[in-house]
Amino acid sequence: MATPVPLVFNAPKRGMPPTHFADLNDEARIEALKELGLPKFRLNQIARHYYGRLEADPLTMTDLPEGARQEVKDALFPTLMSPLRVIETDDDTTQKTLWKLHDGTLLESVLMRYSDRSTLCISSQAGCGMACPFCATGQGGLDRNLSIGEIVDQVRNAAATMQAEGGRLSNIVFMGMGEPLANYKRVVSAVRQITQPSPAGFGISQRSVTVSTVGLAPAIRKLADEEMSVTLAVSLHTPDDELRDTLVPVNNRWPVAEVLDAARYYADKSGRRVSIEYALIRDVNDQDWRADMLGEKLHKALGSRVHVNLIPLNPTPGSKWDAAPKARQDEFVRRVIAKGVPCTVRDTKGQEIAAACGQLAAEESA
C-alpha cells in the first residue's frame, strides 16, 4: 500500500516570484512609481491598462512617457507565467492551459465557454497540501503558495482571451490546484481585485465568484467576516466522519459537524446559498444510506441555503478510484432531493483533456 501523503498547511517559502503590480496596494504602487520619478496620477493610467484594457506590457501603454515604459515594465510587470501547453476540447469551448512559472513550477487554469457565460477555473497554490487520495494535485503535494499577482494574472489572461473573441469573462471559480483558504490573505486580496470596478479591478460581480475549500472551518468563518458575497463551495464528498477522515484528511482536524456549522455561519453572514461539492466514487461514497444521510445533515444544518453539486469523478491514471455509474448517480440525486435539498450533476467540461485537479501538471511532471 502506498504511503499516505501528509497534510501540509504552511507552504514552503521558496520560489515566490518578483513583485508584480497586482501584489501591491495603491500606497506601495505610488511609492514604486515615485522611485521611478513618476507622479502618482500615472497609477490610474497603469491600472486602467491592466484591469480595464487587460494589458500587461507597459511598452504598449502609449500614455506613459516613452522613456519610462521599460522602467515600469522592469519594476512592476515581471513575466509571472508562460504557457507551456494549451489544449482545447468540447468543440473548442474548453481551454486548459498549463503555465510554467518563473521558478519552473507548474500551474493550471481552465477556461470554459457556455452559451450564456464563460467561467474560469483558477489555481490558488502550486500543488496542494490537503492530501485527498482521489485528487491528482493532492497526491502530488504542495510546492508553494501562489502570489497575488500569479492568481490575478490568470484572470487577466482569460479575460483578454474572451475580449479578443468579442466576449466577456463572467465567472471565476477557485477550484483549480490548491486549497484557497490555506493561502487566505492572497486569495482574499485577489478576489477584491477581481471584483472591484475598473480601475481598481476587473469588475466581475462577487456573486459570480466561487471560493472552494475542503473544510478549513476557522478560515470559513473568517471569510464570512470579510462581508463579501462570493459563493462558498465546500468539498464534502461524504457525510460521515469515518470515511471523510480518509477521503478528506483535514476532516481529522475539523469534522463534518464543525464544517457544516461554519458553512451555516457563512450562509447567515453573507445571505448566500452554500454549494456542497460531492465527487461520486464507485462503491466508496455512492451508497443509498450516504445519500440519505447527506440530505438529512445538510437540511438540518443549512435549511434552504444549500445546494449539492454532484461531480462524476474524473479518474486519475493509475488510481483505484473510479466514477459511479449513471444509474447510481441518478438514484443518489433522487434521494438527496427527497430529503429537501436541491441536488444537480455538475457539467464535466474538460474531462477528456484531463482538466480535473492537477492531472495535466501530473502528466507533464511524469
Curated annotation (Swiss-Prot):
Query: From which residue to which does the signal peptide run?
Result: none
Q: Where in the cell is it found?
A: Cytoplasm
Cofactor binding notes: Binds 1 [4Fe-4S] cluster. The cluster is coordinated with 3 cysteines and an exchangeable S-adenosyl-L-methionine.
Transmembrane region(s): none
Obligatory cofactor(s)? [4Fe-4S] cluster
Whether Metal-binding counts among this entry's keywords is yes
Predominantly, its location class is cytoplasm
The molecular function terms in GO held by this entry are: 4 iron, 4 sulfur cluster binding; metal ion binding; rRNA (adenine(2503)-C2-)-methyltransferase activity; rRNA binding; tRNA (adenine(37)-C2)-methyltransferase activity; tRNA binding
Q: Name one GO biological process term.
A: tRNA methylation
Q: Name one Pfam family in it.
A: Radical_SAM
Start and end residues of each Radical SAM core domain: 114-352
Q: Which domain of life is it from?
A: Bacteria
UniProt keywords, alphabetically: 4Fe-4S, Cytoplasm, Disulfide bond, Iron, Iron-sulfur, Metal-binding, Methyltransferase, rRNA processing, S-adenosyl-L-methionine, Transferase, tRNA processing
- Summarize the protein's role: Specifically methylates position 2 of adenine 2503 in 23S rRNA and position 2 of adenine 37 in tRNAs.
Q: Which family does it belong to?
A: Belongs to the radical SAM superfamily. RlmN family.
- Other notes: Reaction proceeds by a ping-pong mechanism involving intermediate methylation of a conserved cysteine residue.
Q: What is this protein called?
A: Probable dual-specificity RNA methyltransferase RlmN
Q: Which organism is it from?
A: Corynebacterium glutamicum (strain R)
